[in-house]
Amino acid sequence: MSLNVDLDVCVLERPNVCSFKKRSCSKLSCSLTKKRRSSKVMSVEIFEDEHDAEELKVVDAFRQVLILDELLPDKHDDYHMMLRFLKARKFDLEKTNQMWSDMLRWRKEFGADTVMEDFEFKEIDEVLKYYPQGHHGVDKEGRPVYIERLGQVDSTKLMQVTTMDRYVNYHVMEFERTFNVKFPACSIAAKKHIDQSTTILDVQGVGLKNFNKAARDLITRLQKVDGDNYPETLNRMFIINAGSGFRMLWNTVKSFLDPKTTAKIHVLGNKYQSKLLEIIDASELPEFLGGSCTCADNGGCMRSDKGPWNNPDIMKRVNNGDHICSKRSQADNAGENIISQGNNSAVEEAPETDQSQPSPCQNVVVAHPAWNIPEAHKFSLSKRDVYAIQEACKATNESGRSPIFTGVMAFVMGVVTMIRVTKNVPRKLTESTIYSSPVYCDENSMNKSSMHGKKMATTTISGEDFMAVMKRMAELEQKVTNLSAQPATMPPEKEEMLNAAISRADFLEQELAATKKALDDSLTRQEDLVAYVERKKKKKKLVRFQINAYLTNFCFGV
């Protein structure tokens, strides 16, 4: 999909909206010039949050599209959230707009805005027993660290203590808690905007039993939730305790993933401690991962939920909105903003800028340089609808839009599982490269010269090869399911056959003993006969000697 967008179409289809916006703009301008600043305006501690000027322009243009389509609720009017969605669709406005619309629809249908108040996950202790996972501390850059011990996952018992729907609800609830509490707390502690996490996956002991059909169905659902509604939130991932076979499989799996994604994933063996300590302080790393933390007073590291969000002072500042940050472009890194706290949107005084930079007083739409928009197609909006590059970002408790567990991780583990159970993958399948992550567009290369100055091309895989792999995996999975479904006790008919075989063996053993006894008796009798024959021979020799002696005496008259 080309990055070119004809913004004039939106204006032609919505003349009433545009005129309404212009009237609102005039009224708002008058009110702002006549009224004094609200007494609620106060200076807060500013956190530097520099961004590329081109990204600010693209986000602003996307914001205008959302406003025209009436798809920008106040709580989602957040720069970082819109930028993540744009990156997820490679800055394709049309696809990003569709993704954003689907996200709003999903949040309304799922009830994501109220899940923290409405949902209670009573079986959390049992779930963590069969699926050890959770946050523990932050890395050296202030990002929260999420840990999963996949080798200890028992998906069968997990589905016995909860249901798939309830676990998905719990998953979304943890997302919302992270966005509303954890990332704002990390931002205050690090004095910069935090909206990504560091993930550690311990795969020691991972086998087929950890990824049966129930586990894969759960991963698929979580992947869809993450990829569609919480994109671009993984900073880095460490897969530790990976054996030689796992690393070999990873080299194959990498060909299925976007290089941008694989650059975030580090597969390590059992000597991972030094690498983790480069990223995470020992005091923030659990002892079983090479750190010094035990969390003995909180039931262990996997149950402690350690992090700055447990600090009362930081949470007080989060509740007061102190995690609001200033947004400055790299082109203009000067000027200090005043943040207005109140029910209405923030009223700010933008610093004086060069005429080449967009200003909120100039009713122009900031367009990406790659867009070929004729001059006649440009239109004006109210200054409330324009993001000035120097304008401070509005961050509330809902502004930390980043998940605990991204769709990238779910996809990687799903592909690893597929490769583990399918030994005979076609050769050309392993040699191909495909962008399989749900947060990217199609396989056509897209021009991002204004953003990165590079082009990335992809190669597709044939549907026949993919279906062959999936069919093979389904067959093997069915065999494993059938074997797992067999009872632990022996069926009655087989038990009878076994008892008959044992009885027959006992009978044969008795016959063998009798035969052995008969052989022993025969051997004894044979020995007796041999002794009797020897005695007869000796007696015969004696008689013959006596006869010879008698005849000799008789003949010679002795």
Curated annotation (Swiss-Prot):
Keyword rRNA processing: no
Residues annotated as signal peptide: none
Subcellular location: Golgi apparatus membrane; Cell membrane
Residue ranges of coiled coil: 464-529
SMART domains found in the cross-reference section: CRAL_TRIO_N, SEC14
Domain of life: Eukaryota
InterPro entries: CRAL-TRIO_dom (IPR001251), CRAL-TRIO_dom_sf (IPR036865), CRAL/TRIO_N_dom (IPR011074), CRAL/TRIO_N_dom_sf (IPR036273), PI/PC_transfer (IPR051026)
GO cellular component terms attached to this protein's record: Golgi membrane; plasma membrane
Family: Belongs to the SFH family.
Stated role: Required for transport of secretory proteins from the Golgi complex. Catalyzes the transfer of phosphatidylinositol and phosphatidylcholine between membranes in vitro.
Name of the molecule in the record: Phosphatidylinositol/phosphatidylcholine transfer protein SFH10
Organism: Arabidopsis thaliana
